[in-house]
Design a protein with these regions (language model features):
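A short acidic, Gly/Pro-enriched loop at the edge of an enzyme's catalytic core
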Residues: 100-110, 335-345
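Class I (Rossmann-like) S-adenosyl-L-methionine-dependent methyltransferase catalytic domain
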Residues: 1-43, 49-101, 119-126, 140-230, ...
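A short glycine-rich, Lys/Arg-flanked "PGG" loop and its adjoining helix->strand segment in the class I
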Residues: 125-137, 359-374
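A short SAM/SAH-binding and catalytic strip from SAM-dependent methyltransferases
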Residues: 108-122, 345-357
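Short helix-loop-beta connector
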Residues: 39-45, 272-278
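Class I SAM-dependent methyltransferase SAM/SAH-binding core
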Residues: 47, 52-99, 280-282, 286-335
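Conserved catalytic/acceptor-binding region of the Class I
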Residues: 149-154, 161-171, 175-182, 372-429
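Conserved Class I S-adenosyl-L-methionine
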Residues: 185-226, 421-492
Length: 492
């Protein structure tokens, strides 16, 4: 590693730092984008790892109370010190990050740009645990890495970079663990957002530059069936990569929600999409609906999902047609922040069933929509209680929070929406389930060959049980349409 950076640090230029001949142009647009993703650093103590020649150091120092800038290449650090000599709140430290020592709770934010991809999995996990100790509770870690493959065009006689998949970073980050003194409470990282750097998409048609923002939070496994975070529950239990592809085989290419492309076309037609509009898809899955909307209506779509496995597949598919205005991010809709009036449409298919406080989420949707903006949701709902014991067990096992169709619609009205339509589409749901079950049985041999006999049985049994729950009146399927009033304010 030292040898690699000795070769690429002789001039301490931005081209060497970014390993790209167009670095100056990229940096001009990328820098404000990266900084805009940070949490507030006003009066914060910031640790910058891999500070390099100081592309970000000075900007951090303008707002933070103090910045500790660390890099293991003295030539880069000397250039950083020269460029940022007017800032009196920066400490420059030449060190290997794997050997760093700081007191517990020393920093509010840890910032890193292109560093972790030079560490082994073992070194990175060790650093994750260290950063958890160094950060105060509620503190944030921001980092950005090259994923999948090389992005810069600089020639390299050898390349020690580890081009991980985004899901691998998620798994390593969430494996980190800090036991607090007295064994009272443990801490770990929880994802706030992970997304591709838009500058690279626009200028280089490259979705492989990915950044993350995580928060140090207390850990309680009880709430996620033994998993440390809800995201781990989704990726490890319900939406493993194999499980996602298994669902796609039933729903149709690109889809993991009821009815696949057919219901997507039906429901999207209700939105009267116009070219240039901005659409937010909450729980985008593997992106089929996003690609359809972008291609058919020339809209700009942002797909968000908490499952890193889902988004990783969507990002892989996005590289097949770089002309489509589609972006994907791993994020939690209950924590994500967008500027008010950012979108013309918010769209969500069979996803909000995982979220407990639906009313609070709908208020967020309201703020994010422009006046006159439209909301379209399909979601699992429930019949009136008491439920059967089988349905109680099913809901608990899946971690669902379900309401009746009418209650769901009432939440939307209370959040400020108008022209609310809350339709019980259970009959359509049953019809779709029967067709999907029939189609699955017709390709039994093909399905088993591609997946396994257990996977086939899982689908057939699962769909049959959905039909039973609908027959019993426990499980419902709702379609919801609503609009933000044209003259309403955001003060809901």
């Amino acid at each position: 590693m030292t040898e690699f950076w000795k070769i690429h640090s002789k001039g301490a230029t931005v081209e060497e730092m970014m390993l790209d001949s167009s670095a100056s142009t990229l940096s001009q647009f990328e820098k404000p984008e990266i900084l805009s993703l940070l949490p507030s650093i006003d009066d914060a103590k910031v640790l910058e790892l891999g500070a390099g020649i100081g592309r970000f150091t000075g900007h951090l120092a303008k707002q933070a109370s103090h910045v500790t800038a660390v890099d293991f290449m003295q030539t880069f650090l000397d250039k950083n010190r020269e460029l940022n000599r007017d800032h009196g709140n920066i400490k420059f430290l030449q060190a290997d990050v794997t050997q760093l020592q700081f007191p517990e709770n020393s920093f509010d934010v840890v910032f890193s740009n292109w560093l972790f991809m030079y560490l082994t999995d073992e070194e990175l996990l060790q650093l994750v645990n260290s950063m958890l100790r160094w950060l105060r509770p509620g503190g944030h870690l921001f980092f950005r890495e090259s994923c999948f493959h090389q992005s810069g065009d600089s020639k390299r006689t050898f390349n020690p970079t580890i081009y991980r998949k985004p899901a691998q970073y998620n798994h390593i980050m969430q494996a980190g663990f800090q036991q607090a003194n007295g064994n009272e409470k443990s801490f770990g990282f929880e994802l706030v957002i992970s997304k591709s750097v838009q500058t690279y998409i626009k200028l280089k048609k490259n979705q492989n530059q990915v950044c993350w923002l995580l928060e140090k939070v207390s850990r309680e496994n009880a709430g996620h069936q033994g998993y440390a975070t809800f995201q781990q529950f989704l990726d490890g239990k319900q939406y493993s990569r194999q499980g996602i592809l298994r669902y796609e085989k039933i729903f149709g290419e690109g889809y993991v929600s009821t009815g696949g492309p057919d219901t997507t076309k039906e429901f999207v037609s209700l939105l009267d999409l116009q070219a240039g509009q901005k659409v937010l898809d909450v729980g985008c899955g593997i992106g089929g609906g996003n690609f359809y909307m972008a291609k058919a209506f020339k809209v700009d779509v942002l797909g968000m999902d908490l499952s890193s496995n889902m988004v990783e597949i969507a990002m892989e598919r996005a590289t097949e047609d770089s002309t489509l205005l589609v972006q994907f991010e791993i994020s939690d809709a209950t924590k994500r922040e967008f500027p008010e009036e950012s979108f013309d449409v918010v769209y969500s298919r069979d996803t909000i069933l995982h979220i407990a406080d639906k009313f609070a989420l709908f208020k967020r949707f309201y703020r994010w929509l422009k006046p006159g903006g439209k909301l379209l949701i399909t979601d699992y709902c429930c019949g009136e209680k008491p439920w059967t014991s089988k349905f109680e067990d099913y809901v608990k096992q899946r971690g669902y929070i379900l309401y009746s169709v009418s209650k769901y619609g009432k939440f939307l009205e209370e959040a400020g929406f108008q022209n609310v339509r809350a339709e019980d589409r259970t009959d359509q749901f049953v019809d779709i389930l029967n067709k999907e079950l029939e189609r699955t049985k017709s390709i039994q041999d093909e399905f088993i060959k591609e997946f396994s006999e257990d996977d086939y049985s899982y689908i057939v049994d699962g769909w049959s049980k959905k039909l039973e729950r609908c027959e019993a009146g426990d499980q419902k399927w709702g379609l919801f349409y609503a609009e933000r009033p044209i003259n309403a304010s955001n003060g809901v």
